[in-house]
From Swiss-Prot:
The keyword Cytoplasm belongs to this UniProt entry's keyword annotation: yes
Organism: Xenopus laevis
Residues holding a 1,2-diacyl-sn-glycero-3-phospho-(1D-myo-inositol): K36, R40, K238, R242, R293, L294, F295, S296, R297
Comp. bias (Basic and acidic residues): 454-468
Record membrane topology: Peripheral membrane protein
Domain TLDc residues, every copy: 337-549
Residue ranges of the region described as Disordered: 450-471
Name this protein carries in UniProt: TBC1 domain family member 24
Length: 562
């Protein structure tokens, strides 16, 4: 029997029937691109033994730290750790967050083995402080292990991966939380319809997205998680983001037209993923996942690092009540002459997650500080990012999220020069809501650059004297000054001088404001591929600029808490 060698922990009566002998018993492929296609196409999905041997091969090739516990270590310690206790009664360590162990059609020996292996992992990896995916990972790999010790060694190698460019499993709350924030960022950009629905029906969309890994490692049926894991072992962490975004898209497609209650949407999502086989095949799930044109692995890594840094700056490195992590726009604390609390919450759902940690902070309003561009700069410099809100005399409302400090304009002297990053976006709220993001998000081919020219530009424009590590500026999405993109006009984010402010450029300007902040104009521009944000020429009634209050550093501006 095919399962004899690797089926010791499996209850075969509960497993879905499937062809077992239709694939070769060895993996001869060594070319990465070919291996990637085989994984995506489910080449070893039909043979339990082949999949087991592929997993063994791929996991053995993971670069690990020098001292990584192996099967012999497990055999030495398991008796001491378990003692005379029943395996089924072993408590799970706190770092798995009391998550229920997915059964994955394991037999009673298998479910006990999961607890024994996790207990030994806890003993050998004292640096793990938060790893909710671990029970699912162990239960899955038990299917493809000859004994507990082999499973322990394979899990240990995944946890001990030391390739800085190959993120596999989050093992701290900081890493986990920043992953949730990164998923929220990606959902806002690549799943705008589903994200809008989640914001509308959820009291806390960030709390909802904190479950994104559980959808995969916990809720997905076994036939689906194995197909995902096939690709994950070849391509890495980015696959998980793709699959979770695809799940969100399918949920929106299937449930979007049905009434949902805010207190049930989290459970509804979990149930939808658990019963995914009722509406979506594993092939369709992966097809949808890989149809999403995500940013590069480098881009996502930079975004993750930025989110981690934001959490560290807030002192958030260990698990705590979520309301202490994400601070919402509270009705009793927020006052604007342009937008309502609900509208500000909608805007908050659009901004990068690391800034949603902060509260809105009023920096400038023409009602208090006057209609003067010089005063605008005076009150806004030193703050990044900022949120610009404009209300016209015709009661139209529009604005922009601006990623970069306005003092950056001084680098070019008196010359009007564009700066900013791909996180900038423009929007209108009245008469209808519409957001326009960087055109490269939907058309990544516009952002493809010659790597050598990008590196050269990055190194020349960002010197060590300003205290910025050039390696953190190699991304056209996060870099302050755009690189040699095929179309320069696709990266004209923001510019300012004593004579005007311009947001968005290339064959028009998304927003142009005069030096007295009295009049402006708006049109289509290449950077955001936007429609005019209001009447093409308009008179400003009210203008507000909001910053993001760092709770660790309360400066003199007007906080929305007052």
């Amino acid at each position: 029997m095919d399962e004899a060698e690797y089926g010791r922990f499996v209850d075969w009566d509960k497993m879905e029937a499937g062809g077992q002998e239709q694939s070769p018993k060895v993996l001869s492929c060594t070319d990465f691109q070919e291996l990637k296609q085989m994984a995506r196409q489910g080449h070893w999905a039909k043979s339990h033994t082949l999949r087991a041997k592929v997993y063994q091969k791929l996991i053995k090739e993971i670069p690990c730290r020098t001292v990584t516990p192996d099967a012999s270590v497990y055999r030495d310690i398991v008796g001491k750790i378990v003692g005379k206790r029943s395996a089924s009664s072993l408590p799970l360590p706190e770092f798995v967050d009391d998550r229920q162990i997915p059964s994955y059609s394991l037999n009673s020996e298998g479910t006990g083995a999961v607890r024994k292996i996790i207990s030994c992992i806890s003993n050998q990896f004292p640096d793990i402080s938060f790893c909710p995916a671990l029970p699912s990972l162990v239960a899955l790999l038990l299917h493809y292990s000859q004994d507990e010790a082999e499973c322990f060694e394979n899990v240990s190698r995944i946890l001990a991966c030391n390739d800085p460019n190959r993120r596999l499993v989050d093992q701290t709350f900081l890493a986990f939380e920043s992953s949730c924030m990164t998923f929220g960022d990606l959902a806002g950009k690549y799943c705008q319809g589903p994200h809008k629905l989640m914001v509308a029906v959820s009291e806390d969309v960030l709390e909802l997205y904190s479950d994104w890994q559980r959808w995969i490692f916990g809720e997905l049926p076994f036939a689906y998680i194995t197909r995902v894991f096939d690709v994950f072992l070849v391509e890495g962490y980015k696959v998980l983001f793709r699959v979770a975004l695809a799940l969100l898209k399918f949920f929106h497609k299937v449930r979007g037209g049905q009434p949902m209650e805010s207190n049930n949407v989290k459970r509804d999502l979990q149930m939808f993923v658990r019963d995914l086989n009722k509406c979506v095949t594993p092939e369709k799930l992966l097809e949808k996942a890989f149809a999403i044109r995500l940013f590069s692995r480098k881009e996502i890594q930079l975004l993750q690092m930025a989110n981690e840094k934001a959490l560290q700056q807030k002192g958030i490195t260990v698990k705590q009540k979520r309301q202490n992590v994400h601070l919402a726009v509270h009705a009793e604390n927020f006052t604007s002459e342009i937008v309502s609390v609900k509208e500000m919450r909608d805007i908050w759902s659009w901004i990068p997650e690391r800034f949603a940690l902060s509260q809105p902070l009023l920096l400038f309003t023409n009602r208090e500080h006057g209609n003067s561009l010089s005063r605008f700069y005076l009150h806004c410099e030193g703050h990044e990012p900022t949120l610009l809100l404009i209300k016209t005399t015709n009661q139209e409302v529009c604005g922009a999220f601006l990623s970069t400090d306005w003092s950056e304009r001084k680098r070019s002297g008196n010359k009007l020069s564009f700066f900013g990053t791909g996180e900038c976006f423009v929007f209108r709220l009245q008469p209808e809501v519409e957001r326009y993001e960087w055109v490269v998000i939907k058309h990544p081919e516009l952002g493809k650059v010659n790597s050598s020219s990008a590196d050269k530009e990055a190194n020349s424009s960002q010197s060590d004297k300003d205290g910025i590590d050039p390696s953190s500026r190699l991304s056209p999405f996060l870099a302050t000054r755009h690189f040699n993109l095929p179309s320069k006009t696709a990266s004209m984010f923001m510019a300012g001088s004593i004579d005007c402010i311009i947001i968005g450029g290339g064959d028009g300007q998304a927003l142009y404001l005069d030096p007295d902040l009295n009049y402006g104009r708006t049109s289509h521009c290449n950077t955001f591929n936007n429609q005019p944000l209001c009447s093409e020429t308009f008179q400003i009634s009210i203008i507000e600029v909001w910053g993001f209050k760092d709770n660790m550093n309360n400066d003199g501006a007007h906080s929305a808490l007052h």
